[in-house]
């Protein structure tokens, strides 16, 4: 949907060559790239006076918005915090196709699929290193998630069309209009605004706050050199993504991925929240499997 990466802090100059190549390839493929709806992506609230909520979500990409909107729908107070100047993260710059078994388009096209087949393909594609229970939770939850995105969030998908990745037994992937994550982030951001969910950008989480019993009850943040503490009665949700844009961290956990390897991740994908969670007692697993 867009070749305009100005909404990704720090990406503009380093992406000029990539953007030229993308635009050229798009023209040859007959695809029209549109500008990102910057107003929807950037229109975030100022730092609110309220610091106490039922739920605090850290990270305003696709997962963070989904978590915040779900919390709001359940009737609890929620705030969404994002360290970058704009929302979106990797979700914004992704291809955004979504594998969904038994979708409305598969049924229309007469494609036979199932969550079980989706799980088999996923496990095989990951060299069977994935946890089958977790994979099956994902594949069985894909259709309800896609229906929520379409019916509640208002995501538009290409009609009568699906994509098939290498490793898929059949065509399962829904394609958002524009073929990037812009469709997701602009619509999720707009719905968060409509639901009056405070979304604060430029707010970097630096530490989790525990009470005397060792329970995480808040998150300490920094913005423009000032400290802000946000507290949550129900819990803190970390939706901060991975660390593929942190070369030192990548090399630490997978030495074979040294300085020769670049990344497709958004600039903010640097992994500080993983260490923050670890300091609070979380166990980090599978850190060697990294999106590059």
Feature-to-residue mapping (PLM):
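Conserved N-terminal/central alpha/beta ligand/cofactor-binding core
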Residues: 86-198, 202-207, 248-256, 290
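Helical element adjacent to the flavin cofactor pocket in flavoenzyme catalytic cores
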Residues: 176-234, 274, 278-280
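Active-site- and interface-proximal helix/loop "cap" or "latch" segments in soluble metabolic
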Residues: 1-40
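Glycine-rich FAD pyrophosphate-binding loop
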Residues: 73-93
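Gly/Ala-rich phosphate-binding loop of Rossmann-like dinucleotide-binding domains
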Residues: 68, 72
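Glycine-rich loop(s) and the adjacent beta-strand/alpha-helix scaffold that form part
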Residues: 226, 231-292
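Short glycine/serine/threonine-rich phosphate/pyrophosphate-binding segments
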Residues: 62-67, 246-247
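Beta1/beta-strand and adjacent pyrophosphate-binding region of the FAD-binding site
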Residues: 44-63, 79
């Amino acid at each position: 949907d867009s070749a305009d990466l100005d909404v990704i802090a720090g990406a503009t100059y380093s992406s000029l060559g990539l953007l030229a190549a993308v635009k050229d390839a798009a023209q040859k493929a007959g695809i029209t790239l549109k500008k990102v709806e910057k107003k929807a992506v950037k229109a975030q609230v100022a730092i609110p006076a309220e610091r106490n909520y039922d739920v605090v979500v850290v990270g305003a990409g696709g997962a963070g918005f989904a978590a915040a909107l779900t919390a709001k729908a359940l009737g609890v107070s929620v705030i969404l915090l994002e360290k970058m100047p704009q929302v979106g993260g990797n979700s914004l710059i992704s291809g955004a196709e979504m594998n969904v078994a038994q979708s409305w388009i598969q049924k229309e096209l007469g494609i036979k699929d199932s969550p079980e087949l989706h799980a088999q393909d996923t496990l095989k594609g990951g060299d069977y290193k994935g946890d089958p229970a977790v994979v099956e939770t994902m594949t069985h939850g894909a259709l309800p998630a896609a229906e929520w995105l379409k019916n509640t969030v208002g995501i538009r998908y290409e009609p009568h069309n699906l994509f098939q990745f290498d490793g898929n037994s059949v065509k399962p992937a829904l394609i958002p209009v524009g073929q990037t994550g812009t469709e997701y982030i602009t619509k999720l951001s707009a719905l968060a605004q409509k639901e009056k969910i405070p979304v604060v950008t430029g707010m970097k989480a630096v530490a989790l706050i525990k009470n005397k019993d060792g329970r995480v009850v808040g998150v300490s943040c920094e913005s423009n050199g000032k400290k802000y503490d946000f507290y949550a009665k129900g819990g803190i949700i970390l939706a901060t993504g991975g660390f593929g844009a942190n070369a030192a961290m990548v090399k630490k956990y997978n030495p074979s991925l040294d300085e020769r390897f670049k990344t497709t991740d958004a600039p903010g994908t640097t992994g500080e929240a993983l260490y923050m969670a670890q300091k609070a007692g979380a166990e980090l697993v599978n850190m060697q499997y990294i999106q590059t």
